[in-house]
Amino acid sequence: MQDTLAVILAGGMGSRLSPLTDDRAKPAVPFGGKYRIIDFTLTNCLHSGLRRILVLTQYKSHSLHKHLRNGWSIFNPELGEFITVVPPQMRKGGKWYEGTADALFHNMWLLARSDAKYVVVLSGDHIYRMDYAAMLEEHISKNATLTIACMQVPRHEASAFGVMAIDDDSRITCFVEKPADPPCIPNRPDHSLASMGIYIFNMDVLKKALTEDAEIEQSSHDFGKDVIPKLIATGSVFAYSFCSGKGRVARDCYWRDVGTIDSFYDANMDLLQPVPPMNLYQKNWAIRTYEQQYPPARTVSSATGNEGIFINSIIANGVINSGGSVQHSIISSNVRINDSALIVDSILFDDVEVGEGCKLIHCIIDKHVKIPPYTEIGLNPIEDRKRFHISERGVVVVPESYQFSTE
């Protein structure tokens, strides 16, 4: 796909995912015991044959840059392949990106330099698997100028998305960004057709649309709010069904925006279902990431004779469970679990130590936290709220490197 450029938007603040995003960009947030969120979009590019990639970063990007350098420096420049991380260049004035379209407009020089005919615009903060090659093939076959990936969502949730209407040929006839009263799908009044934020543009159309949008002072410079509605009138904008079953990836129709603590928690817990709604085990679509070379996880007996137990959990390398019990949880690399500790319905990031007799229920523990013996988290909301963030649905989040009081 030498005529196609992938651009991944990875610069959002991710404030709704705080405190997990207090010191890192949302695409760099750990997920599923060993991955980062951006790994899913990058893996899709890799397996789809997209080997020319720009990653546009902005806020708190150090952790993301480090991960991309360590884990994704796999492309061969001699074959025209690259993954280039692009922080704001301030080429269009001394200001940060003001919207999704503005991010690309500020980097128009890189788009032009690529000599690409098509541009695949992606978000770096969604969890899903998709063969972009199949979408590009349909884009070309329909002679489209813009193709938007879409999926059906319950109408009561559709206000969080761009919503579209299509004709019998999948041509988009109407597009509204985050409408208060979302239009429904004909013959299915309880569902709407939502944009996934995945776009394929013809390069010439994209450059013209970005230039025109940049000249409008009152524009918010956003694809969904400003650019796409204007292009609909051309009659050559089409929808691509995410659940069409096309392409090499297994048809699981799983796509999640993990922009809040609750949605992030739910997506992790989805991996623990007896038959997970997203299949991470498809051999020819393995999710790539970077991970340090830790030894295998193990369980050992404690000094009191308790055996370390894992039940229906995901356990990363380097974990040692010395007489604790882990149930329906995700344990990331290099975690230490001590005697009689109980961990249930929880997510632990790297380098956490759980002290003897601790009880962790329905919580997320960020990196580099040492939990003192007999600490209880997730059992008393009143006490937890004094120290930690609690989500709308009661998930307790302990921030990175949190220091417990020794009093």
Swiss-Prot record:
Catalytic activity: alpha-D-glucose 1-phosphate + ATP + H(+) = ADP-alpha-D-glucose + diphosphate
EC number(s) given by UniProt: 2.7.7.27
Domain of life: Bacteria
Signal peptide interval: none
Keywords in alphabetical order: ATP-binding, Carbohydrate metabolism, Glycogen biosynthesis, Glycogen metabolism, Nucleotide-binding, Nucleotidyltransferase, Transferase
MF annotations from Gene Ontology: ATP binding; glucose-1-phosphate adenylyltransferase activity
Chain residues that bind alpha-D-glucose 1-phosphate: Y97, G162, E177, K178, S195
Enzyme class: transferase
Pathway the protein acts in: Glycan biosynthesis; glycogen biosynthesis
InterPro entries: ADP-Glc_PPase, ADP_Glu_pyroP_CS, GlgC_bac, GlmU/GlgC-like_hexapep, NTP_transferase_dom, Nucleotide-diphossugar_trans, Trimer_LpxA-like_sf
A Pfam short name: NTP_transferase
One of the GO biological process terms: glycogen biosynthetic process
Function: Involved in the biosynthesis of ADP-glucose, a building block required for the elongation reactions to produce glycogen. Catalyzes the reaction between ATP and alpha-D-glucose 1-phosphate (G1P) to produce pyrophosphate and ADP-Glc.
Subunit structure: Homotetramer.
NCBIfam families to which the protein is assigned, alphabetical: glgC, PRK00725.1, PRK00844.1
Family listed: Belongs to the bacterial/plant glucose-1-phosphate adenylyltransferase family.
Name of this protein: Glucose-1-phosphate adenylyltransferase 2
